[in-house]
Amino acid sequence: MSQPCPCGSADEYSLCCGRIVSGERVAPDPSHLMRSRYCAFVMKDADYLIKSWHPTCNAAAFRDDIIAGFANTRWLGLTIFEHTWSEAENTGYVSFIARFSEQGKNGAIIERSRFIKENGQWYYIDGTRPQLGRNDPCPCGSGKKFKKCCGQ
């Protein structure tokens, strides 16, 4: 039986992000790279995570930390609520919420990730995390307060 893609699409993993993670195809844009990186966290694929970071980030130096992070984390879902990129400038941004459970406590990573394209390949560079108050609107666009939505 086929496995659904953890990125949240309705497609099978092998027909969706699995093709990017395996190297069968390159991510056509930053949003697809973000989705494939989320899948790599779910599948505990440190090699792909390192490969998809820009080489100047020296992610291989953090391999042990990446692998240690897999131990107690269960990923619960990804919501991308904004993505923009410029082929002319070879830069892109993806804003997302990645939900997880770690040692029985639920949490979320809310980030605006920055990507760069070099030699036809998109790479993750870094990200910024907004400072949200409990009564701020949730960045996912639900219209709810952060504390009643993704901040739970």
UniProtKB/Swiss-Prot annotation:
It comes from the Bacteria. InterPro entries: NTF2-like_dom_sf, SEC_C_motif, UPF0225, YchJ-like_M. Signal peptide: none annotated. It holds the Pfam family SEC-C. Belongs to the UPF0225 family. This is UPF0225 protein YchJ. It comes from Salmonella typhimurium (strain LT2 / SGSC1412 / ATCC 700720).
